[in-house]
Amino acid sequence: MALVAGSAAYQVLRGVTGTFPTQSATLLARAPALCAHTMNRRRMSSSQQTDHLERTANTFRQEIISPAKVCGITNESATVKRVRLAIANREFTFKAGQWVDFFIPGVPKVGGFSICSSPGLLETEGVLELAVKYNLHPPAHWIHSQCALGSEVAIRVGGEFCFDPQPSDLPLDLVLIAGGVGINPLFSILLHVADLHKTREITGRGFQMGNVKLYYCAKNTGELLFKRNILDLVNSFPGKVTCSFHVTQQSSPICRELQPFITEGRITEKDLASYVSTDQLCYICGPPPMIESMCKQLQSLHLPKERILFEKWW
């Protein structure tokens, strides 16, 4: 999951200087889309990489730690479980793109999982969702082996990678680029974009959202999380929400529904060139090598680095 952010963002300069641990930085002006922080180039040891609290020690967190109860569990893919949590504290809020500290009774390690639902779902139904890939790290392993309906946990919101435009902000087009489970915070952003469009259509007020395109790469179509939800958004907002799915190790036939949206192979500069322009804001989440490659390609297309926001995960 996405656990540490490093970025430069629209109207904010905090630097994109490296790869892993965070350092403090200075906010120069408010961005309609963000929170970002500077990172240095020192690589972390394998033991450090497994400690979410260490990695994010200098990252913004809310003060509220809310009890939460598991009220839904589904298999999003063969390796990813989607968990719905009912949030007890009514003052608990988050911004699209943020993550949670995940506290499990009896499990000493604290998990760090990106939220994959929209802030609007929390406001209307009092729930949020996480999508957690299987691994042996204790919090993720607990979700896959012991988590059940009614399980009680506690969560706290953190993260400086978010999309939170205000009604007075200028219209904005987005590019979202995801690799693997890096889709989680970007799916939250995409759902929030849909909510902004709905609010504008119904009330004529609120932030005037521009267009958004999602580029999403995974090993195969089975590992493209939320793909049907994403296609529903594409169909609900024609021209305003578009997507391009990429698969790198597809061995089975691609179903007819997905075929128009699938490209076999990684996301390339040529793929990006068909949509990217210099006035857009780009969010990227995925493995560090992918992010480094995407940043270079976007800058080759003359997208200013201050408009590229990213979050790296392991």
From Swiss-Prot:
Domain of life: Eukaryota
Matches recorded under Pfam families: NAD_binding_1
GO cellular component: mitochondrion
Protein biosynthesis in keyword set: no
GO molecular function, one term: oxidoreductase activity
Binding site for NAD(+): 180-185
E.C. number(s) listed in UniProt: 1.-.-.-
Leading EC class: oxidoreductase
Name of this chain's protein: Oxidoreductase NAD-binding domain-containing protein 1
Organism this protein belongs to: Xenopus laevis (African clawed frog)
Taxonomic lineage from the root: Eukaryota, Metazoa, Chordata, Craniata, Vertebrata
